[in-house]
């Protein structure tokens, strides 16, 4: 037998997955912010194997870039084997073994559509496999309803004597509740030898990987099984219903992990957390919150309700309420929301504020500066301790190009100020309400625009006679005359 202490992993991801009814290859569908395949590859990488081989086939032009992207993040070599014709699991492993030429050790075979399988379970499988000399160890699970699965038949020594498919089992065999998961650990040398002896003499006309077990036993090699503690880890995803079910189980796992690590999640059923999200201690997450992508939440933050953060960094003690944010950073002790839209490239400094119905895009808001209400701020820099009045607009687009606005520190702008970029407002400047700023404003200046207010008496009654407005004006004048 081979040296059991070195390992390699084969991940099977060549199938068509027709039940997904999708233009996307099955294993590229996502739960928890990762594709099904990425979950499987991450679990495999958790073994720290010498090599991982992903077997691809159907729509491989879609799958190969995903394999390469995961390889760049897990710190483990992942090679690709192409199964040109989908001729069964045995054939898929034959294709993979070309990438493992000369490898001697334990070969784990798993699938690209089992996103809930943990590295720890694979490690337990390998440990069980290597504890005593073994040719094959099959990962099994116990089900209350095993209908449709291959049954695991053992002898008195606990060795697996057969995997009996549902259609081939007799009455006693079908009472067995331990079933085949489709995940195996093999001795590399015995696997390589047995693969060459497979035949397609079966109903499907394919090469079955499970036949390696019977070949190994026939040649006198021990075959064993290791039972997984949680059968849900081994649930395959073949259609959209199973995708949603797996996503819910994974989210429950991630939410519970966050709570065990010190976060308060008020309503776990309405809180969604992606796999790459990190959450500090004493964070409070209110209902309807989604933390997606590579979002990072520091200690003591309060999030939600009804908040979605994607690839966001939230520093300590920040409050984010009813906000959608993407690819941006919120500083310590900042206050965001409600009904705030944060677009990519925005940075809010310490003690900063983006208030109700504010949209920010590629905006740098300095320490202590506030944009409290009803404002669009795009392509802008705001210094420290400045205040932007309600209903202000940073007019950054001339129809062809985007332009930048720079606001200094300790600036106070009146409500309904328009900043026509490119423009700079110096430190300590003020603007009057309704000002349209088209030119740079010096530090400490007060800027106002527009002429003196002019009231044209009687205009409505003269130009809009008979309208409700004219009638109201006439009645008001009559009342004023009577009062006079």
Predicted regions and their residues:
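Conserved alpha/beta core of the MobA/IspD/sugar-nucleotide pyrophosphorylase nucleotidyltransferase superfamily
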Residues: 2-5, 177-280
């Amino acid at each position: 037998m081979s040296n059991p202490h070195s390992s390699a992993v084969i991940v099977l991801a060549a199938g068509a997955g027709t039940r997904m009814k999708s233009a996307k290859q099955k294993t590229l569908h996502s739960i928890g912010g990762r594709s099904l395949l990425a979950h499987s590859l991450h679990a495999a990488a958790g073994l720290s194997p010498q090599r991982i081989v992903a077997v691809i086939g159907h729509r491989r032009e879609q799958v190969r870039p995903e394999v390469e992207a995961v390889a760049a993040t897990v710190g483990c070599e992942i090679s690709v084997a192409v199964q040109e014709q989908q001729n069964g699991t045995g054939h898929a492993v034959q294709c993979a073994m070309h990438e493992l030429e000369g490898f001697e050790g334990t070969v784990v075979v798993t699938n690209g559509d089992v996103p809930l399988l943990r590295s720890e379970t694979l490690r337990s499988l390998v440990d069980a496999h290597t504890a005593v000399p073994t040719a094959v160890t099959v990962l099994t699970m116990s089900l209350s309803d095993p209908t449709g699965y291959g049954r695991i038949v053992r002898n008195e020594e606990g060795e697996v004597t057969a995997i009996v498919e549902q259609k081939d089992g007799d009455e006693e065999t079908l009472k067995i509740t331990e079933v085949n998961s489709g995940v195996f650990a093999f001795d590399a040398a015995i696997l390589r030898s047995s693969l060459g002896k497979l035949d397609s003499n079966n109903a499907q006309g394919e090469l079955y990987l499970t036949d390696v077990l019977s070949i190994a036993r026939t040649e006198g090699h021990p075959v064993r099984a290791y039972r997984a503690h949680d059968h849900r880890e081994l649930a395959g995803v073949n259609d959209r219903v199973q995708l949603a079910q797996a996503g819910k189980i994974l989210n429950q796992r991630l939410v519970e992990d966050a709570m065990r690590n010190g976060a308060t999640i008020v309503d776990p059923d309405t809180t969604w957390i992606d796999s790459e999200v990190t959450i500090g201690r004493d964070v409070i997450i209110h209902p309807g919150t989604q933390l997606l992508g590579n979002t990072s939440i520091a200690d003591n933050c309060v999030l939600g309700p009804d908040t979605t953060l994607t690839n966001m960094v939230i520093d300590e003690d920040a409050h984010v309420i009813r906000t959608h944010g993407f690819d941006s950073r919120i500083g310590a002790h900042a206050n965001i929301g409600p009904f705030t839209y944060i677009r990519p490239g925005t940075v809010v400094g310490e003690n900063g504020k983006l208030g109700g119905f504010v949209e920010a895009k590629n905006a740098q808001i300095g320490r202590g500066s506030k944009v409290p209400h009803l404002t669009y701020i795009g392509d802008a820099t705001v210094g420290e301790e400045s205040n932007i009045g309600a209903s202000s607009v940073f007019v950054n687009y001339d129809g062809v190009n985007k332009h930048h606005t720079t606001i200094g520190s300790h600036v106070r702008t009146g409500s309904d100020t328009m900043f026509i970029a490119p423009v700079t407002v110096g430190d300590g400047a003020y603007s009057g309400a309704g000002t349209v700023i088209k030119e740079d404003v010096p530090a400490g200046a007060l800027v106002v625009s527009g002429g003196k207010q002019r009231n044209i008496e009687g205009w409505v009654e003269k130009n809009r006679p008979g309208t409700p407005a004219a009638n109201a004006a006439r009645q008001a004048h009559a009342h004023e005359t009577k009062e006079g």
